[in-house]
Regions:
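Basic, amphipathic alpha-helical segments enriched in Lys/Arg and hydrophobic/aromatic residues
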Residues: 234-251
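Charge-patterned, long linear interaction tracts outside catalytic cores
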Residues: 184-206, 219
Length: 251
């Protein structure tokens, strides 16, 4: 298949042959509509194995000239583009077409200052709610410039952790800044011995319970993926050319 290469599967936890698809979904909590998508490949870490393929595999891969079709050229340009930049382009196209939303819900891969800046600068008053990694990113807070793990330790030490019966999680909240933008960080843990996870939002009016409730709507895109795979054979397209793969997903 044209452009196909090795991509890392987070379900199988190993590189597999295929594409990565990114979808933009709109939901009201009941119905969901897929607004846009893009296909991506991974260039690979080794120069002698582009996309994780040996030279013979690369040479044997199907290739086709597309006679300057602008639509295919745009899709091809997306293939190795930054997923953050592509996501912002998707949002721009949707907004131009009249789509309005209250919250953009994203996983930890997309929660970053670039996307945050884009969302809070929109004129119709939308906000970002995203999972954050319990990693090395530092946030400006009244507790100092600390990482998420350092913040939850400080909150535990100061006894600012509460149990929420309604959602069944221990929670903690802290106001912060990232790239000079005010945000709230909400920490959640299931049980006394569970791992801490955290959400970031630009909506300073939310509390931990409401942020949790809103973010849980992101599950609908996982349901949509499952239904597309089961009922519409997503990922089973046998077309060899890239345009055919794009058309198959569009249909």
């Amino acid at each position: 298949t044209e452009k196909i290469g090795k991509v890392f599967s987070h379900t199988q936890m190993k590189p597999i042959l295929g594409f990565k698809a990114m979808f933009l979904c709109f939901t009201d909590g009941v119905s969901q509509f897929l607004l846009d998508f893009s296909l991506h490949g991974e260039e690979g870490k080794r120069s002698d194995k582009p996309q994780g393929l040996f030279k013979k595999q690369t040479e044997a891969r199907y290739c086709k000239e597309h006679s300057g079709d602008e639509r295919i050229a745009r899709r091809s340009a997306e293939y190795f583009a930054s997923k953050i930049e592509t996501a912002i382009s998707m949002l721009k196209r949707s907004i131009i077409e009249g789509v309005r939303f209250d919250y953009l819900l994203v996983d930890s891969w997309f929660t970053c200052s670039e996307l945050l800046k884009f969302v809070v600068s929109r004129h119709f008053g939308c906000h970002l709610i995203g999972m954050i990694k319990m990693g090395k990113t530092k946030y400006e807070t009244d507790l100092g410039n600390k990482t998420a793990p350092e913040l939850i330790k400080a909150l535990q030490k100061s006894k600012n952790v509460k149990y929420s019966r309604s959602i069944g999680y221990y929670t903690a909240t802290v106001s912060a800044k990232i790239s000079s933008i005010k945000v709230c960080l909400f920490f959640y843990r299931r049980g006394k011995n569970g791992n801490w996870n955290a959400l970031l939002t630009s909506d300073l009016k939310l509390d931990a319970k409401e942020a949790f409730r809103l973010y849980s709507r992101r599950w609908v895109i996982e349901v949509a993926h499952k239904e597309m795979k089961q009922n519409l054979k997503l990922g089973k397209n046998q077309c060899r050319d890239f345009a055919g793969q794009i058309a198959g997903i569009s249909l």
